[in-house]
Amino acid sequence: GDVYKRQELIKEKYRDVLFHGSKKGLSEISISDSRENCDFGKGFYLGETYNQALSFVCEKEKSCVYSFRYSLLDLKIKKFECDLEWMLAICYYRGTLGEYVSNSMVREIVNEIEKADIVIAPIADNKMFYIMAQFTEGEINADVALHSLSASKLGRQFIFKTEKALQNLVPIEKYYLSVPERKDCRKVLNERSYEIDTKLKLAKREFKTGLYIEEILK
């Protein structure tokens, strides 16, 4: 309730707002502090909703959420939908593509990302990444993977990958997380996990004719 109200008030006041969850708090906004093996490599990662930012840090006791105003003016943007390109990009940066890293289709996707100031893409949490990894390991086909992943509804992430992009971010506020908020967040995460498992089970039965990774990246 309160969380949602807070988010709506911020959005009403500033319109273009993004949220960033931090496990220990931010001393500065930077790209260099980012890990290499995130979804799209190094960058400053933000999401469209407060809850979504919260869901990535609610397990940690000192975690908090920040809101930012942003602009996409004069920036090079690479957008992804919930599709094969998106899945391959994330598996590339998270290091599970193995022999396919130098495949021409993969290289093309990575080049576009490296040229961009900002990447906008559906969010993938660890549960979703586990499904993607099953695809890259040849255990499930692309249709099964994408159908299961479309259940997630985590919204979009905005990855600011260059200094030029970071200049378009203006901090608004910092929010500390209450105990009930953390509890509620864990409950939602467990429900989501169950939902994705169910979807995967059904998709395996339904999409038997989809292509496997070795057929796509010949």
Where are these regions (language model features)?
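Short cationic amphipathic helices and targeting signals
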Residues: 42-45, 119-121
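ADP-ribosyltransferase catalytic core
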Residues: 8-16, 31-42, 48-110
